[in-house]
Amino acid sequence: MEPWLWCERYSIPDRIEPELMTDTQYTHGHHESVLRSHRWRTADNSAEYLLPHLRSGMSLLDIGCGPGTITIDLAKRLAPGRVTGVDPCADVIAQATAAGAGESTVEFRVGDVYDLAAAVAPASGYDVVHAHQVLQHLADPVAALREMRRVCRPGGLVAARDADYAAMAWYPRPPALNNWLELYQQVARSNGAEPDGGRHLRSWAHRAGFSQVTSSASVWCFSTEQERQWWGSLWADRVTSSDFAEQATTRGFADEQQLTEIATGWRNWAADPDAWFAVLNGEILCRA
């Protein structure tokens, strides 16, 4: 089968309704190629829209904290305020706990965004509840935002930032990367997720009951040789070795040869000195 015929041969619903999903499978999984990108994230490169609103002494809950780099960065800024990171993956929480061992104001717990009882909120609620690249992966992001609001103090902030895959831009545009985008969207939506979540954040917040919502957007750009090699190699590895690869093949969206062709396309793209990639991220600040 030719790679450009994937979408014609394999059709799936545009959206799997949340009520049909009891759990959402994480599209990326926790392969090293995934965690490599997660560990790159900091408050400066991933939460700049939130930083002007933070003050020393604030309490903060970080949803889907992963290996904890953003969480720990935020804890340093908010000390002596308490910062808690939660993630459903116990192995990743163990990594985050080890990384934050030297910070007395941060702790990590296994937790579920739909039921944040494990977060042990302060009596009055957290000053800030934050989620980075989380809502796009959920079957019911509106329910998640409601739960985030529940553990936020009245007048506090609920903040979220998510990529929008359909709005990503790159040059040059080899067929392999176009096929990658189509395949990623197929796999993500088969998990009940919304890969173009960035554009939906404002709507989701309104549906969750927020009336004061400030929207913004920002971009990650990869263009230097080091940036291209890092971005291209991690996606080449994800395409062939992560949970995404397993989901794509077991569900009949692609075979191993097609995944190898996409991975080669990523490496060839990264080697081109003219190459450039931009990831658009939607952002919201919601007053609880």
Describe these PLM feature segments.
Residues 22-42:
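Class I SAM-dependent methyltransferase Rossmann-like catalytic core
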Residues 61-63, 67-116:
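Class I SAM-dependent methyltransferase SAM/SAH-binding core
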Residues 115-129:
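A short acidic, Gly/Pro-enriched loop at the edge of an enzyme's catalytic core
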Residues 127-140:
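A short SAM/SAH-binding and catalytic strip from SAM-dependent methyltransferases
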Residues 159-229:
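Conserved catalytic/acceptor-binding region of the Class I
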Residues 212-288:
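Conserved Class I S-adenosyl-L-methionine
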